[in-house]
């Protein structure tokens, strides 16, 4: 009659180790199923970082007063940089100041540091210079011709709210934070939970020099959210001063959409800065056909112009089995982004369930 042979200590240890590994693998698998990684891509100045801020406001805890205060130096840096751009443009466009005192005030602003971290507050002479210059007729004329040079998208907002921004007790609110602009460098990840799912949104800098880092983020991506600035159709890249921004976005989208890493990945397209696009198409003479000769629609027709640009993106998709989900967005508008992002999350969940044959 045979007896049982007891396991050796080494065998018991190996079995325990195997059980721990199996348990960890099951836990990792559950976590993977409950975590959706969204890769946020697009060219520089497209509004990606603003989309991330909106996610924090809509699905996170928003911005505390302490967090909002940390943006003050950035906002002041944006304000100073925007005013410098206008003042330099006045010289190039040959626009005189409305009064002689403005020339001295302009020198005060032009002498400010370019560093965004330089200003937690401005001295009285700088504050006075900002306010007086904004009221100057020449500055106003130059500002009204901003389509003729490259002015930060947030400049109108900051100029129009200048009196509030320059108060001694000023604390940035969420709208001020949304309008703030710092070039994204490196990889920034934001996480939030909606309906028992964790979303990891990975934002990578869109400037050309940052794109070599993108491939580091391609693993386990469940959706790509590509952001394009509609209003860039008449503008050139800061990097080289000659490449059309919209053309750059189209080429970049084609490379991403048809990348082997994303054959089965949900592809969401945000046609962003729709508010600026509408204003430019409707109120300026910078007609779309002047920059994209293949556009044959009417001038000042926002719907026709946006349909044309959307179709240009769709044509860059070489895999006709792949569905692109386009949305017109204004990233600074929390209500708009809340509605659109709700649709986006539902789309991502549905596509992932279909891919797993659960629908």
From Swiss-Prot:
Signal sequence bounds: none
Region (G1 motif) residue spans: 37-50
Presence of the UniProt keyword RNA-binding in the record: no
Lipidation (S-palmitoyl cysteine): 4
GO biological process, one term: adenylate cyclase-modulating G protein-coupled receptor signaling pathway
Single GO cellular component term: heterotrimeric G-protein complex
Keywords: GTP-binding, Lipoprotein, Magnesium, Metal-binding, Myristate, Nucleotide-binding, Palmitate, Transducer
Keyword Magnesium: yes
N-myristoyl glycine lipid sites: 2
InterPro entries, per database record: Gprotein_alpha_su, GproteinA_insert, P-loop_NTPase
SUPFAM superfamilies: P-loop containing nucleoside triphosphate hydrolases (SSF52540), Transducin (alpha subunit), insertion domain (SSF47895)
Superkingdom: Eukaryota
Annotated segments matching region Disordered: 1-26
Residues that coordinate or bind GTP: 42-49, 178-184, 203-207, 272-275, 331
Entry-linked Gene3D superfamilies: GI Alpha 1, domain 2-like, P-loop containing nucleotide triphosphate hydrolases
Role description: Guanine nucleotide-binding proteins (G proteins) are involved as modulators or transducers in various transmembrane signaling systems. The G(o) protein function is not clear.
Oligomer status and interactors: G proteins are composed of 3 units; alpha, beta and gamma. The alpha chain contains the guanine nucleotide binding site.
Name of the protein this chain belongs to: Guanine nucleotide-binding protein G(o) subunit alpha
Lineage, top ranks: Eukaryota, Metazoa, Porifera, Demospongiae, Heteroscleromorpha
């Amino acid at each position: 009659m045979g007896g049982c042979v007891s396991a050796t200590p080494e065998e018991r240890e190996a079995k325990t180790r195997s059980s721990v590994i199996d348990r960890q693998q099951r836990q990792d698998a559950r976590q993977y199923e409950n975590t959706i990684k969204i890769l946020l891509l697009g060219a520089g100045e497209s509004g990606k970082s603003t989309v991330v801020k909106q996610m924090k406001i809509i699905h996170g805890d928003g911005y505390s007063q302490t967090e909002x205060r940390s943006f003050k130096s950035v906002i002041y840096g944006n304000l100073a940089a925007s005013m410098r751009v206008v003042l330099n443009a006045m010289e190039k466009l040959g626009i005189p100041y409305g009064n002689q005192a403005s020339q001295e005030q302009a020198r005060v602003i032009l002498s400010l540091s370019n560093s965004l971290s330089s200003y937690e507050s401005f001295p009285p002479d700088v504050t006075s210079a900002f306010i007086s210059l904004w009221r100057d007729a020449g500055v106003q004329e130059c500002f009204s011709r901003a389509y003729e040079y490259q002015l930060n998208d947030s400049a109108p907002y900051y100029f129009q709210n200048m009196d509030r921004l320059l108060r001694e007790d000023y604390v940035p609110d969420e709208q001020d934070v949304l309008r703030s602009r710092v070039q994204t460098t490196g990889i920034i990840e934001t996480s939030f939970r909606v309906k028992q799912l964790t979303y990891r949104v990975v934002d990578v800098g869109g400037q050309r020099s940052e794109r070599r880092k993108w491939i580091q983020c391609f693993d386990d991506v469940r959706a790509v959210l590509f952001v394009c600035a509609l209003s860039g159709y008449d503008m050139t890249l800061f990097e080289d001063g000659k490449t059309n921004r919209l053309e750059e976005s189209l080429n970049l989208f084609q490379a991403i959409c048809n990348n082997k890493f994303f054959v089965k990945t949900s592809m969401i397209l945000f046609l962003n800065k729709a508010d600026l696009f509408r204003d430019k198409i409707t109120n300026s003479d910078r007609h779309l056909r002047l920059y994209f000769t293949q556009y044959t629609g009417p001038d000042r027709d926002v719907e026709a112009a946006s349909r044309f640009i959307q179709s240009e993106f769709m044509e860059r998709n070489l895999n006709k089995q792949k569905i692109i989900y386009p949305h017109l967005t204004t990233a600074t508008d929390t209500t708009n982004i809340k509605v659109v992002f709700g649709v986006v999350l539902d789309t991502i969940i549905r596509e992932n369930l279909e891919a797993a044959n659960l629908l």
